[in-house]
Amino acid sequence: LLFQTKGNLKNPLKKVYSGKVAMLANGPSMKNVLPRLTTDEFKNTDFIVLNFFGSMDIFTQIRPKHFCMADPMFFQENHNHDRVMKLFDDLNKKVDWEMNLYIPASLKRQFLAFSGLHNSHIHIVPLNLTVYTGYEEFRHYFYRHGLSMPSVVTVALMAIYVGINSGYSEIDLYGVDHTFFDSLTVNSKNQLCICDTHFYDKNKVELKPMLRWDSTVWRMSDYLEEKMAVFKNHDIMAAYAVSQGVR
């Protein structure tokens, strides 16, 4: 494990926060939560946001302290290029408060070149994505010290890890619907398709082939294997949260 970390043994996360943090994911149920984010219900709550939340109008109203990115589309050319570039432009122009942006450590240089981010209020925090698969007691030690983290098969797992290791005692999850199989089907070309819905979708979402970051279509076996890893790593994070006294 120490060799896999490539000599980077410094823990980037410090327990300098406390209380409650709300992690805002992109599932369709977030539509019901958005109107409440600026009410007293969330008055003493910090926020962790993900992906394209930075292009939402409410982003500048709740002024999140934490932002997580892990999807390859934020680090290199892809079929979502225009949308990704708009997000980076929004972050450069709109963020006038101190905010941590968490990314994979191995992609920091690539991210800075690709994103063009130059906002001094945004602090890049590189995370060690090394995965440890051994004994639980060792895994928790490595997690605490930033030597390892769960497999980031979904950015929500990165956000939960950030919340735990930043010192929060309670992490509330919103929009983590994980409706991966609700509309799963194949089209006439035998391509795997789904209606992939997010809370920020303004138009009716159409059934379309499921594309990877490199624009190739997912195979069913690969897709199911990845989603199994999502739920397995949620179990791992739940055990880690309990070990750290976080609920």
Provide a role label for each language-model segment.
Residues 1-247:
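Metal-ion/cofactor- or nucleotide/acyl-coenzyme-handling active-site neighborhoods
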